[in-house]
Amino acid sequence: MENAFKSHLQFTEKAIKKIKNLIEIEKNHDLKLRIYINGGGCSGFQYQFIFDTSINEDDIIITQSEVSLIIDPISLQYLYGGQIDYLENLEGSKFIVSNPNAKNTCGCGSSFSI
């Protein structure tokens, strides 16, 4: 299923630029960013990001500005209405999620609770 959920999870321009840059470095234009939720972290759930070429039967593909995100339906429920950004500062660089469904987040921003 592609783009039916586009308005439910968005990329910022910085995230789009970084994803395109990483795909260029890998020289594999079939790569898509997969985001999924795992149990763990100090708040109960963790965001996980990987580049992937495999698409499972129930995966949802969201494309924005020629960048595709793969997400499973269960993870999308936790991220509904969210935004993926990319942050670079003195502490390092990472993809971050602005999640309106999270009741609490940890200090590092990589885990949350609902």
From Swiss-Prot:
Keywords: Iron, Iron-sulfur, Metal-binding. Pfam families: Fe-S_biosyn (PF01521). The gene is erpA. One of its GO terms (biological process) is iron-sulfur cluster assembly. Binds 1 iron-sulfur cluster per subunit. NCBIfam families: iron-sulfur cluster assembly accessory protein, PRK13623.1. Belongs to the HesB/IscA family. Its cofactor is iron-sulfur cluster. HAMAP family: Fe_S_insert_ErpA (MF_01380). This is Iron-sulfur cluster insertion protein ErpA. The keyword Metal-binding applies. The keyword Heme does not apply. PROSITE patterns: HESB. It comes from Buchnera aphidicola subsp. Acyrthosiphon pisum (strain Tuc7). One of its GO terms (cellular component) is cytosol. Iron-sulfur cluster binds at C42, C106, C108. GO terms for molecular function: 2 iron, 2 sulfur cluster binding; 4 iron, 4 sulfur cluster binding; iron ion binding. Homodimer. Required for insertion of 4Fe-4S clusters for at least IspG.
